[in-house]
């Protein structure tokens, strides 16, 4: 029979709680929902209130242009567009002409809206002529007081190209640069009918005009080898070797093979008979391409001297490419394996691991003694701790823990071979 469970002090949180939620559809019952929630609660629609930025706005009084029409029309004209933003003024909507606009008085084309507010970098010529005069249009005899300046000889500038000496000592021309006024020659407007200009043949430049007289580079056609192109200094080897593409005209001869020529290609030709009885029969194994390319010339037909036995073949000697290389010795354990791709690296840095019967001494007799590696040599000597004593261990443990260990394992306290556990005879 169970007794009454002790109850603690009721907290204010428990007093305010309405108990657990009995609705099986409410799967997620939070603490706030169980404490303050009400059944069939529906939120009321409230009014939307502006944010902090909106509440800080001052009341805006809209301006109407008709307010200053009678009282102050000048001020109304100045502030008629103050309520408009810069973006709305600059990026106005597209206006397409409908044909009701009056014709323009100016016949010249006006600039677009993008260039309307462009800042003028330099003054216009019309504005400059209102203030300054052009000494080229109005000479010194036309306007009084514009006579050439008389400078004493001592104060005259003797340097070349002085700008004060131009245009009767009035400087360069009107609105032109110094180079344009001094060194630019004006082309005549009238056509050149009297001067007959003729264009001659194209000649070589100074770099290649006299290059044929060079005795070192130049090779006359008479001294060129037969079959070799004549090397002129003015013409590169690329141009002489790679000629432009010439399309067939239709009058070329058809390709015809000569009589008695072999019509089989080098890819389909099979040598079934032995060409030279002294040479061994080629093996079925694939050989290197370099061995095929650098084979000695094979005699297709013996001459009369060879048939009489008066021809002798000497010993084969290495060429200059293989004379200085170390001699290759074929290994005894790979007699059947042909070293077709023998490189200089394999000759100099050969593999010195014994193979075959030479390797049996390493594995004969079972497991060999292990040698200390680099990791074992660098490690210090580890001292083993003494054997733990169960009696000393129980003295330092809690009594409850010690009794639990001895009850579970009776051999934990003393050594099994002690006198406490006599053996049955």
Curated annotation (Swiss-Prot):
GO terms for cellular component: axonemal A tubule inner sheath; ciliary basal body; cilium; cytoplasm; sperm flagellum. Keywords: Cell projection, Cilium, Cytoplasm, Cytoskeleton, Flagellum. Expressed in brain, ovaries and testis. Expressed in the tracheal epithelium and in secondary spermatocytes and spermatids present in the seminiferous tubule. Expressed in ependymal cells lining the ventricular walls of the brain. Residues 259-297, 315-335 are annotated as: Disordered. The keyword Cytoplasm applies. It is found in: Cell projection, Cilium; Cytoplasm; Cytoplasm, Cytoskeleton, Flagellum axoneme. Residues 277-290 have a biased composition (Low complexity). The keyword Cytoplasm applies. GO terms for molecular function: phosphatase binding. It comes from the Eukaryota. Residues 260-272 have a biased composition (Basic and acidic residues). Residues 321-332 have a biased composition (Polar residues). Microtubule inner protein component of sperm flagellar doublet microtubules. Interacts with PPP1CA. PANTHER family: PROTEIN PHOSPHATASE 1 REGULATORY SUBUNIT 32. This is Stabilizer of axonemal microtubules 4. It comes from Rattus norvegicus.
């Amino acid at each position: 029979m169970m007794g009454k469970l002790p109850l603690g002090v009721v907290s204010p949180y428990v007093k305010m709680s309405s108990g657990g939620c009995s609705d099986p559809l409410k799967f997620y019952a939070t603490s706030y929902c169980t404490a303050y929630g009400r059944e069939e609660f529906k939120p009321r629609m409230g009014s939307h209130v502006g944010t902090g930025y909106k509440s800080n706005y001052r009341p805006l009084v809209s301006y109407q242009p008709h307010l200053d029409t009678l009282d102050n029309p000048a001020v109304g004209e100045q502030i008629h567009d103050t309520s408009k933003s810069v973006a709305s003024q600059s990026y106005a909507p597209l206006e397409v002409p409908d044909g009701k606009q009056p014709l323009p008085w100016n016949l010249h084309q006006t600039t677009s809206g993008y260039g309307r507010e462009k800042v003028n970098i330099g003054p216009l010529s019309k504005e400059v002529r209102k203030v300054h005069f052009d000494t080229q249009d109005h000479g010194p005899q036309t306007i009084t007081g514009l006579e050439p300046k008389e400078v004493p000889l001592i104060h005259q500038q003797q340097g070349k190209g002085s700008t004060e000496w131009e245009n009767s000592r009035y400087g360069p021309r009107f609105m032109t640069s110094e180079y344009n006024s001094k060194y630019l020659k004006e082309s005549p407007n009238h056509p050149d009918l009297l001067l007959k200009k003729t264009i001659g043949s194209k000649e070589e430049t100074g770099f290649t005009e006299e290059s044929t007289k060079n005795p070192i580079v130049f090779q006359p056609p008479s001294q060129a080898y037969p079959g070799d192109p004549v090397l002129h200094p003015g013409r590169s080897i690329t141009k002489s070797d790679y000629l432009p593409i010439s399309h067939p005209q239709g009058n070329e001869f058809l390709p015809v093979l000569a009589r008695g020529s072999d019509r089989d290609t080098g890819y389909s030709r099979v040598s079934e008979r032995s060409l030279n009885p002294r040479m061994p029969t080629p093996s079925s194994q694939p050989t290197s391409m370099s061995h095929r390319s650098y084979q000695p010339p094979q005699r297709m037909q013996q001459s009369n001297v060879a048939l009489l036995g008066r021809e002798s073949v000497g010993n084969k000697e290495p060429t200059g490419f293989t004379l200085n290389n170390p001699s290759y010795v074929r290994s005894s354990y790979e007699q059947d394996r042909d070293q077709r791709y023998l490189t200089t690296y394999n000759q100099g840095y050969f593999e010195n691991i014994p193979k075959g019967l030479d390797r049996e001494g390493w594995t004969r007799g079972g497991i060999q003694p292990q040698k200390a590696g680099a990791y074992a040599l660098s490690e210090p000597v580890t001292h083993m701790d003494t054997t733990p004593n169960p009696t000393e261990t129980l003295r330092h443990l809690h009594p409850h823990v010690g009794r639990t260990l001895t009850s579970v394992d009776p051999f934990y306290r003393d050594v099994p071979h002690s006198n406490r556990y006599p053996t049955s005879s």
